[in-house]
Structures are given as structure tokens and as C-alpha cells.
């Protein structure tokens, strides 16, 4: 999902 993608970016 879009939210999951955003969280992935923040983790980096």
C-alpha cells in the first residue's frame, strides 16, 4: 500500500 511505501522510505 501507499502507506507501507512511505514507511519504507522513512526507514532508510
Swiss-Prot record:
| EC number annotated for this UniProt entry | 3.1.1.4
The record's remark on the cofactor is: Binds 1 Ca(2+) ion.
Report the subcellular localization.
Answer: Secreted
Intrachain S-S bonds: none
Q: Which cofactor does it need?
A: Ca(2+)
Q: Which UniProt keywords apply?
A: Calcium, Hydrolase, Lipid degradation, Lipid metabolism, Secreted
Q: Name one GO biological process term.
A: lipid catabolic process
Recorded catalytic reaction(s): these are:
a 1,2-diacyl-sn-glycero-3-phosphocholine + H2O = a 1-acyl-sn-glycero-3-phosphocholine + a fatty acid + H(+)
Please tell me where this protein is predominantly located: secreted
Q: What does the tissue specificity note say? A: Expressed by the venom gland.
Return the similarity comment. Belongs to the phospholipase A2 family. Group II subfamily.
> What name does this protein carry?
Basic phospholipase A2
Tell me the organism. Vipera berus
